Design a protein with these regions (language model features):
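A surface-exposed partner-binding patch
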Residues: 2-132
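A generic alpha-helix preference that emphasizes hydrophobic side chains
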Residues: 106, 147-148
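A short, surface-exposed interaction/processing loop segment used at functional sites
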Residues: 129-147
Length: 162
């Protein structure tokens, strides 16, 4: 996975008493509140970007447009952060779309550069799990049992593994 660089070497230093660790950007604050373990691991990365959430009505309209029912966790993520991206990861509601594979009803929810650029993150109908599609060989692997565990557990593990 591509490397990220914290914005400051002091990121591991404890904050002064009474100082807030909350980011100034409202979308990043929402990301921190929803996915605390993920944010603790990546909050200082220079290239971390988060976009403000969508309204519940906009999320419902996106589900209707894509003809795909989102999991409860994906809906919650989208109402807090419509996009999360950094080197090697991109999950953006505006880029969601059906996968072009015969006989598949999967939805592409993003890109995750674990092995190769352009590998995809997928969700399946009526399944809250997050899957990884390796473009090179077409292999599909379950990454996590849900969106929150994907960010808070799986991504954190991959970021800090050798």
């Amino acid at each position: 996975m591509p490397e990220n660089i914290p914005t400051s070497p002091a990121s591991s230093v404890a904050a002064a008493p009474g100082a807030s660790n909350a980011p100034e950007d409202p979308a990043k604050r929402a990301l921190q509140a929803l996915l605390p373990e993920f944010y603790a691991a990546v909050g200082e990365f220079e290239d971390l970007k988060a976009a403000p959430g969508l309204s519940p009505e906009a999320v419902a309209a996106l589900e209707k447009k894509l003809e795909f029912g989102f999991s409860k966790e994906l809906r919650e993520l989208l109402t807090r952060c419509a996009a999360v991206s950094m080197a090697g990861l991109s999950v953006k509601a505006a880029e969601f779309g059906p996968i072009v594979m015969p006989g598949s009803d999967a939805l592409i929810i993003g890109e995750f550069y674990l092995y190769n650029p352009g590998d995809r993150l997928l969700m399946l109908p009526d399944d809250p799990a997050v899957y990884y599609l390796e473009q090179r060989n077409g292999a599909i692997t379950q990454m996590a049992d849900g969106v929150f565990n994907f960010f808070n557990k799986t991504l954190v593990k991959y970021l800090y593994s050798d």
